[in-house]
């Protein structure tokens, strides 16, 4: 069955390519892998781009029907994401999203004023949705889980912009991706605006056959099990 993209996903990918947040070529990743594409959400750096980015996150969240009280953005990349998506949910999500709160952590605890490492909403006895850009080794979300657990909050899900759909390690017999690993470990859904298969579908006719072939080969080599 062919993969269908919704309008918000198409718009997200169009803008990602336009602002070069999504680029194609040959890129060395932290993992040491040579990737035929590179994704940098930090290039969504204007008011217009951020508004559209927030809309994409918000629609993905609304469609998931996930019940939560607080959006938590791990420092640093998650901080602006939590804020803009909280605002966008209030704008387009209807009455049940009007009072969604947001919070983030400091990298270093503050020992004066209000103190602590949590800024924004208190997390105790709250249902928490963690927001971030991508998930690779899952390190950031593991740290976020610890912070939220220490604050007596309950993580009910996570959302990222792009699911790369590749195995964390080629030695993993289960062949799980970072998102699948986190979902299995913590028993939560990991949502995304788009995944690599959406990118491949969207790019049909927009890139050369050679570029498309390289992405498909990369997915065949490093792709996670379904």
Curated annotation (Swiss-Prot):
InterPro entries linked to this entry: OPRT, Or_phspho_trans_dom, PRibTrfase_dom, PRTase-like
Keywords from the named record: Glycosyltransferase, Phosphoprotein, Pyrimidine biosynthesis, Transferase
Entry binding sites for 5-phospho-alpha-D-ribose 1-diphosphate: 30, 76-77, 106-107, 110, 112, 132-140
GO molecular function annotation: orotate phosphoribosyltransferase activity
Annotated catalysed reactions: orotidine 5'-phosphate + diphosphate = orotate + 5-phospho-alpha-D-ribose 1-diphosphate
Binding site for orotate: 38-39, 136, 164
One Pfam entry name: Pribosyltran
UniProt modified residues of type Phosphoserine: 213, 225
Family under the similarity heading: Belongs to the purine/pyrimidine phosphoribosyltransferase family. PyrE subfamily.
Function noted in UniProt: Catalyzes the transfer of a ribosyl phosphate group from 5-phosphoribose 1-diphosphate to orotate, leading to the formation of orotidine monophosphate (OMP).
Identification of the protein by name: Orotate phosphoribosyltransferase 1
Organism: Saccharomyces cerevisiae (strain ATCC 204508 / S288c)
Lineage: Eukaryota, Fungi, Dikarya, Ascomycota, Saccharomycotina
UniProt gene name: URA5
